[in-house]
Amino acid sequence: MGAGGAFIGLGSGAVLANPLVKNNSISTKGEIWKWSKEAEYYVQTPRGPKCQLCPNECNVKEGEPGDCRTRVAENGKLYSIAYGNPCSANIDPIEKKPLYHFFPESRAFSVATAGCNLACLNCQNWQISQKSPKETRNYELMPNDLVRKASENNCQSIAYTYSEPIVFYEYMYDSAKLAKKQGIKNVMITAGYIKEQPLRNLCKYIDAANIDLKSFSNDIYMRLNAGGLETVLNTLKIMKEEGVWIEITNLIVPDWTDDMDMIEEMCNWLYDNGFDDTPIHFSRFTPMYKLKHLPPTPASKLKKAREIAFSAGLKYVYIGNLPGNEGEDTYCPNCKEKIINRRGFYITEKHITGNKCVHCGETIAGVWG
């Protein structure tokens, strides 16, 4: 992901010289405050500042960061130490997020800081998500520089991604606000574990999001991810209300989230709550982090989940991390013809004009540019 070096690697094989690179880890108190900002959401309590950004509601004591590792207390105030110091930056095809129905074939300038407010046993980016910005090698890339670099590299969007953008909320918010003024879109790839007020304020500047709906069981959410289901469902509803284009990812983890009855319940909930034209990506698990002992998701389970979703009335259902399968492609929900053919993150054939199927004229949900 290009973290920690003098260059940002691009998917095309090119490299981009990074502006204002700091190759050394930010390790001392004096240095870390350069990349800090007072947190937007917290209240004072007798036990110290209490974060109001996510449902964890950490009471942060001086010298002890919050669960996300990006919130620290100083003189009774709460600060984010994830501001202008991304540990990862890259230029990606928007399809990599994955966002299949949002400005297809466009480029996204992708950034992440260290930290996360969940603790997923299967995290694919645990090397940065389960660390503090004090522990990673970081770039210096303040919001105005981030927006400028996105523009210079012909990126139609900035993607807040890789780790969990909620924990670098202030950096994302300020960057997104500047980007919006410059006509650059903002997208976030998130687990959606955030409280309502900060989410609604953020949605003013976010154009699209991929929400990781990790399971449809609160018990599994707690044991697998250290989170909760209801908050994520509320995030989906709020972002839809606020006009953000949404796509959903559901990672099917063997022995954890591969119960087809649960997947059917999830798909029925999505349909019943107006998400029938929201693309859903069933993603293949690969052994990772604390679940290395599990096998990869069988292709048969991914295909079965796709069938269940279609049967529930969902219109755009994809399979991820399984190259060469028909679940990579987009089909018209009316005439059933293939209208977008993909190979990995790249489109090889397209039969859509504007937002219409060329075969039958059906409107295809999305933001097509």
PLM region spans:
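N-terminal [4Fe-4S]-dependent radical SAM core
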Residues: 29-50, 56-112, 127, 338-340
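Extended interfacial segments that mediate partner engagement and assembly in macromolecular machines
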Residues: 78-166, 172-173
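Conserved, mostly hydrophobic/aromatic
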Residues: 120, 211, 317
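Short linker/helix segments within small regulatory modules
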Residues: 62, 345-354
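A C-terminal junction/extension of Radical SAM enzymes
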Residues: 294-344
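N-terminal export signals
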Residues: 1-21
